[in-house]
Amino acid sequence: MVAMDQRESLRTMLAEHGHEATDERLRRFKLAVARELGPYASGLLIDDEYGAEVVEEAIRAVPPSCGVLLAVDVLDQQPGQIVEETSLDEREALPEGLAALKLLVIWRDDERRAERVEMSRRFVALAERHGVLSVLEPVVRHERREWAIVEAARELGATRPSLYKCQVPLGGAGDPDEIAGHCREIDAVLPCPWVVLSQGVDPADFPSAVEAACRGGASGMLAGRAVWTATLGADDPTQLLREVSVPRLQELAAIVDAHGRPWREKAAA
């Protein structure tokens, strides 16, 4: 699955590649990714920060084999900075044709832990009310990162989302067997299927990181930067998406097919 729900972080990345990062350029990039990568993905995660029409066009652009996931997180993020906190947009209406909703949660070992659990519960309930799947994405902020990843999975996985989206242990750069070992710890505390994200992982390390995560119990990946970062410098990313991102996505899909845990196994466990 491909993530294309980056907002101010995408604006920053485009600006770093020399572009005037207007809302229109962000919209064009998101829809180019949907159009070119959708046929090779099982899912596309997108946001409607820059207009509901972006989601509607993305739904029309991808084939039926690619489900569209909508981010319903409101991000507390200053330009050029990381996301500090999130809240849930408990919307009453959704575009037709959505497969799932997604919520980013910034996990910290602080006095707001119970508050974040409650927000996650409300998110899962929101998706259920709308008859779509729920994808929960905790990102930890803690000096003991590997401990925090497992602790967040234990705490927030208990809200039982349809799918849990998790950071790769060791930033994907460690020994594959060690990464797989950490992933088995994550798998042991989660009651639902889970996948890894690519934020914080060098794109060159991501294929081996996905394989290690799958050996540790993951069912795949939901990644953006590792797939399309190489296209950011182009005024029109279409050709690079076809020449660079499609083969990269196909490589990752082959790894998941070979090593990923079928999501139904974990869902039924």
Where are these regions (language model features)?
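Active-site proximal loops enriched in glycine and acidic residues that flank catalytic Cys/His/Asp
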Residues: 138, 168, 198-200, 225
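Hydrophobic beta-strand scaffold residues
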Residues: 68, 127, 134-135, 194
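Alpha/beta catalytic barrel-like cores
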Residues: 1-109, 160, 192-193, 204-220, ...
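Short strand-loop junctions, especially beta-strand C-caps/beta-turns
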Residues: 104-108, 169, 199
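Alpha/beta enzyme core
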Residues: 24-39, 86-101, 112-124, 129-133, ...
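Aromatic-lined carbohydrate-recognition surfaces of secreted/lumenal glycan-active proteins
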Residues: 135-143, 195-196, 261-268
